[in-house]
A protein has these predicted regions:
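Glycine-rich beta-strand-centered segment in the early N-terminal region that forms part
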Residues: 20-35, 48-94, 129
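Residue-level recognition of short, solvent-exposed, well-ordered loop/turn junctions
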Residues: 23-24, 77, 142, 155, ...
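NAD(P)H dinucleotide-binding glycine-rich loop of Rossmann-like/cofactor-binding domains
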Residues: 90-163
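Mid-domain Rossmann-like dinucleotide-binding core that forms the NAD(H)/NADP(H) cofactor-binding site
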Residues: 130-210, 214
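Glycine-rich cofactor phosphate-binding loops and adjacent beta1-alpha1 units
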Residues: 150-156, 195-274, 313, 339-340
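Conserved acidic E/D residue at the C-terminus of a beta-strand in Rossmann-like folds
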Residues: 188, 255, 279
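C-terminal hydrophobic helical "lid"/dimerization subdomain
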Residues: 191, 239-243, 282-344
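Rossmann-fold dehydrogenase core element
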Residues: 250-252, 262-302
Length: 344
């Protein structure tokens, strides 16, 4: 089979690899139909996730068809159409008992990390209908909801700022609207992404720059926001969240940070501020699937480009230069070469 392999810092290539086999009785082999490229894949290429070794097949999101199952698997059978959860869980360890599936002693974030991932024709590892929308439930939409909206304690009537209008920030935007905040402010350096935020429901779109804090304070009558969601993973955006947060507020970090950031305790120590960090645990995936199928969330709105798997390196180049290409989520299709390089 073909797979996209991490061969060195900022280097990937398509290689021929053996088709995966059932190893444990709980395993399933999935023939991929679609996968996507995540911001965390770019962090891996830059060396920001050092536990990922050279030689690893990339990817942790996907949708496909069950090819084979182990002897203990009873809920799925060959031929079933399924989505692949980013996180796997044993259901028995102390972390699973607490719902912290991302830290499962025998699972967690394994695909494209500690085991070969989903950017291949087959992978070793939920029932799902518009597949470009449903593939978003593998990782992106639950990350926005769990790590941003729920950790950030978004609630009716609160004021929310989302710093970063990329796929994860826009996912948080769509989830936040389910909780009826009074204000949602989107901040980004890219006017095109801010316009995407407006289309998807942001009440205000603020261009990041020297006057961004002043504008947010004007919108919030000088109070700041109750929830600041950091959806980039950089020192300037974490700094901005600290400037936007109001008394008693929560800064919810989603972004993957490849380096240190400054924490201004001299300004925050007496303001009852909460800062949260977490990994995706996928407990919201089932709820999001129902919302997608009911049309309450438009996951397909985030898919801007589609490539056939044979052109996945071009897909990476497109996603890495997202601003220049007006790219949000890039779909990689294994089944339909007729959609090659389409702009959705």
């Amino acid at each position: 089979m073909k797979g996209l392999v991490f061969v060195g810092l900022n280097k990937i290539e398509i290689q021929e690899r053996p088709k995966p086999l059932i190893v444990e009785p709980t395993d399933g082999i999935i023939k991929l139909a679609k996968t996507t490229i995540c911001g965390s894949d770019l962090h891996i290429l830059k060396g920001h996730v050092p536990r990922v070794p050279f030689g690893r097949i990339m990817g942790h999101e996907g949708l496909g068809t069950v090819d084979a199952v182990g002897a203990s698997v009873t809920r799925f059978k060959p031929g079933d159409r399924v989505i692949i959860s980013t996180m796997t869980k044993c259901g028995r360890c102390e972390f699973c008992a607490q719902g912290m599936y991302s830290h499962c002693a025998d699972g967690g974030w394994t695909l494209g990390n500690t085991v070969d991932g989903t950017q291949a024709e087959y992978t070793r590892v939920r029932h799902a209908d518009d597949e470009d929308a449903l593939v978003m439930a593998s990782c992106m939409l639950p990350t926005g909801m769990e790590c941003g909206v729920l950790s950030g304690r978004v609630r009716p009537g609160c004021r929310v700022a989302i710093v970063g209008a990329g796929p994860i920030g826009l996912s948080a935007l769509m989830s936040a609207q389910l909780y009826s905040p009074s204000v949602i402010i989107m901040l980004d350096l890219d006017p095109a992404r801010l316009e995407a935020g407006r289309r998807l429901g942001a009440m205000h779109a603020v261009l990041s720059g020297p006057h961004a804090v002043e504008e947010v304070m004007r919108i919030t009558d000088g109070k700041g926001v109750d929830t600041a969601i950091e959806a980039v993973g950089s020192p300037p955006t974490f700094e901005l969240c600290q400037e936007l947060i109001g008394v008693g507020g929560t800064i919810a970090n989603i972004g993957i940070h490849g380096g240190k950031v400054d924490l201004h305790m001299d300004k925050l120590w007496d303001r009852n501020i909460t800062i949260t960090t977490r990994m995706l645990d996928t407990f919201a995936t089932g709820k999001l699937l129902e919302l997608l199928k009911a049309g309450k969330i438009n996951g397909k709105a985030l898919a801007t480009h589609s490539f056939h798997f044979n052109d996945i390196i071009t897909a990476y180049d497109t996603f890495a230069a997202a601003a220049a290409n007006h790219a949000l989520k890039v779909i990689v299709d294994f089944e339909n070469p007729g959609r090659e390089n389409a702009r959705l």
